[in-house]
Every structure is written in C-alpha cells, then in structure tokens.
Amino acid sequence: GKTLAIDGLAARLNFVNKGQAWVVRRIEALLPVVQDAEARAMLEEMRRSHQANIAACEAALGELPAD
C-alpha cells in the first residue's frame, strides 16, 4: 500500500500516525450522535486503540537515530 511506498522508517511512522489521528478525529466527531450503547463502546475502544498506537509510534520515533 501507500505506507510501503514511503522511503524511510521515520517517514512511514509519521504517515501512519497521520492516518491514526484522522481516525481518532472522525470517531470523536461521531461519538456525540451515536445512540446505540454497543456501537458507542466499540467506537470508544477503537479510539483508545488508535490513541495507544499513536503514542507507540511517537515513542518509536523518539528512539530512532537522527538522520
């Protein structure tokens, strides 16, 4: 996919993080209008998972050697 076409690990992680952040924003926009408790719980868990992935990518980026 698009991620594999990006050269360099740091650039790939930044690209993935942008996508993860976009998903978090979309979920946060949807949550106020979701009435179904099960759907809401699933979206909240998905948001937490994406936020954890963002944090993990940021930590990995912080450990990469400088270019």
What are these regions (language model features)?
Residues 1-49:
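Acidic/histidine-rich alpha-helical segments that form the ligand environment
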Residues 53-64:
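Amphipathic alpha-helical coiled-coil segments
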